[in-house]
């Protein structure tokens, strides 16, 4: 299955009926979004689509779902419960976070979830492609266009599970559990600290120069008072 569900829609008139009709099933296991006091058009209907797709998938079924990137780390009850089940059941095979304005009709940052009910991997593969692409004008709007080379890079890295610094990472499901079921690649990238070897003499000279600079700045500050 491939799905690009609407992210937000006013379904307040049918919300309670949906919850009641499926309350005895596992279709909407994480819950149905509440009706807000205002801006009913902002109801997150995509959360129902995700749960519906998971419910309908066959034992060997696969799905790719476009979601708002905020879903990857949201702490709200429904989003959290959905990610938790995906991780606990090992059906989240991977995630690709796309650049902003990749779709002309929405400025919402989007990511793609890849689900696999027959997944045998012990790790999910996460790609952060948000920095790729070139900004172009599209009428009154601005969107991001990926070059063929960038598209091929994303496909190659994701398909072959190639780990690249600050771009892709393979994360054990246990680690995802420890980090609150986050699907954000950036939270799992290795933090690298560069070390520069210098002699004690070089260190002392460096510190003396910094001290002299600070003294000069303080003196200048007093002159301006």
Which residues fall in each region the model found?
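A conserved structural/catalytic subdomain of Rossmann-like adenosyl-cofactor enzymes
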Residues: 2-225
